[in-house]
Design a protein with these regions (language model features):
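An N-terminal assembly and electron-transfer interface module characteristic of large anaerobic redox
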Residues: 1-223
């Protein structure tokens, strides 16, 4: 009899993308998802792990049988974007990111071309939710954010004694207390915290990561 996996200890890379990106207040995410896949990652679980009732800066495209069976998800994402503009949920300074989910990936939705017709600067992150777990996903989304938005880093001069803390996101039970302890250790050793990315950062400031002399990169036991 084959071994049956009764439960999984990790979530998917889609969850990793949402928990990483939505920690930054100047970002809004459109998740290309049915309503249930939005509810879990944005309302039910962060209430449990982070004591926040819901993540405000994410909106689902609410894909249904119509999109799955024929039209594809692009019309749903376009409609969601139009609604956000009408309701003034995104400003000129908001960075808009569209993220794929397992459901949209199952039907081959690639919104690379669509995002070019949305708000200027909108990007599409293919989360690889069907094949990657949250730990691979966290690494990949952080690297992707740097590659997409950190282009000005070359003009930033490093400052001695500054230290980045890279890795804290939503979805970790003891994130605030563990982060406080990491900060205390850095400052006790004579360092000064430059940025906590993405947990206490804005995406617009990502190039300032280059200002640090050192970076402390956290691993999955954090939180």
């Amino acid at each position: 009899m084959p071994k049956v996996i009764r439960d999984l200890p990790d979530t998917s890379s889609y969850w990793a993308a949402v928990w990483s990106v939505c920690a930054m207040p100047d970002v809004h995410v459109i998740c290309d998802a049915p309503i249930g896949c939005y509810n879990l990652v944005a309302t039910a679980i962060p209430d449990y792990t982070d004591a926040i009732p819901n993540i405000d800066n994410i909106t689902p495209s609410v894909i249904t049988e119509e999109e799955v069976g024929g039209t594809g998800t692009a019309p749903a994402v376009q409609r969601t974007y139009d609604d956000l503009v009408t309701m003034k949920k995104i400003s000129d300074d908001t960075k808009l990111i569209v993220v794929s989910t397992a459901e949209s990936e199952m039907i081959g939705s690639d919104l690379t071309d669509l995002v070019k017709m949305l708000k200027p600067g909108t990007t599409f992150f293919h989360s690889e939710s069907l094949t990657e777990d949250e730990w691979v996903g966290r690494d990949r989304i952080l690297r992707w954010l740097w590659e997409q938005y950190g282009v000005d880093a070359g003009s930033v001069e490093p400052e001695p004694g500054l230290v980045n803390i890279i890795g804290p996101t939503y979805g970790c039970f003891n994130a605030p207390s563990d982060l406080h302890e990491v900060k205390r250790l850095i400052e006790g050793a004579g360092g000064r915290v430059n940025m906590v990315f993405p947990y206490e950062s804005k995406l617009a400031d990502i190039a300032q990561l280059a200002k640090a002399q050192y970076s402390v990169v956290l691993y999955k036991e954090f939180g």
